[in-house]
Amino acid sequence: MKRIVTLSLMLAATLSLKSASADEMAMSNSAVSGASDTKQMGTAESRSECDDMNAGEMVMMNSCLMPFGIMTGEAGKWMVGYQFMHEKMDGSLVGTDDISVSQILKQFPNAPTDMTMDMHMWMIMYAPTARLTLSAMIPYFRKEMNMVDVDGNHFVMRGNGIGDLELRPEYLIFQTADKRHQLLLNGGIGVPTGSIDEEMGGFRVDYCMQPGSGTVSLLPGLTYLGQTTTWSWGADFKATVRLGRNNHNYRLGNRYESRAWVMRQLTSWLAISTGLNGAVWENIEGADPDLDPMMEQTTDPNLQGGKRLDASFGLTFCPMPCCHGGSPCCSTAVTKFLDGQQLSVEGRVPIIQSLDGPQLENSWTINIGWQWMF
């Protein structure tokens, strides 16, 4: 985990230096040419819309250059959002080595071949002050896992339902005078609203198919944000720490996640992004007495942990960037409606993963998010 966090922070620092240098060169070239709007290369947006014209400083961070779900410097503002995630898992690993279904069936009478998970997440955020943001998020899961037994019979296991509610405060603990660098302290609690009792054919489905955890969780974290007129970068670390066991005598393993990213605004309405996303998750502590660990790898509590590093690539669309309710760009009903809306699409592919297997490996993930700040 330390290697992932260190790698993320190193990447963020490198991107910060490169991005700042590129932005300074663009501003210098613009000054030489005598351009009054101080427009950056590849973007149609002028500094006057997003920056303080008198002081030359950023009034607030451009939300179009932030990852999905981050909101800062907007006292009295609300944000609502929706995110769809589709994750595909195909094949199994033991450590970093592939293991075939036929090999797994020598250890267990049943083996998973592949799995898909769809998550629909709804989010609402409110900023009572410029430093404090409060948010609530709740997901809905649809999971489907294809299985085969030693006799060659194929069957499908399914698990659907509402997941655990997350309540998260976020506090701005540091920012530079020009507001180009910010440090946010994350906290929160996970409320066990998701079910751990889902059944199929009269039998309880496996741990990974249940939509909930059954336990209260702590959600600490730390986020760094950096931004210029056309570039942004950052890194964060978040953890899910389970408190105690649920009423089926187990608790899911703690999870630790870190990521680093860089974004570039190409036009006034389009930005691209890339980054690294690392995760470490632990094995299950305890065991559900209704799940036989000898039946399949997904019922063994000791075959659930692992770690993974993904590469991500994304696009962000902002139809009316930097309006924030002001004139002249928000002078009509249509532009007022579009102001604050944002659509993001991100794909992830694993670079490396090591699993306490046999365990299904991730093949790819796609995230589609919409948010509206008003």
Show which residues each predicted segment covers:
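Outer-membrane beta-barrel biogenesis signature
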Residues: S21-V101, D178, L184, C322-D339
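Residues on the lipid-exposed face of transmembrane beta-strands in outer-membrane beta-barrel proteins
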Residues: F68-M71, Y82, W122-Y126, A136, ...
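Residues that define the transmembrane beta-barrel architecture of outer-membrane proteins
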Residues: E74-G76, T116-H120, G159-L165, H181, ...
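Repeated loop/turn-to-beta-strand initiation elements of outer-membrane beta-barrel proteins
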Residues: W78, R131-L134, L167, T176-R180, ...
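Outer membrane beta-barrel transmembrane domains
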Residues: L93, D97-Q103, L252-F374
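Outer-membrane pore/translocation modules
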Residues: P139-N247, T298-G306
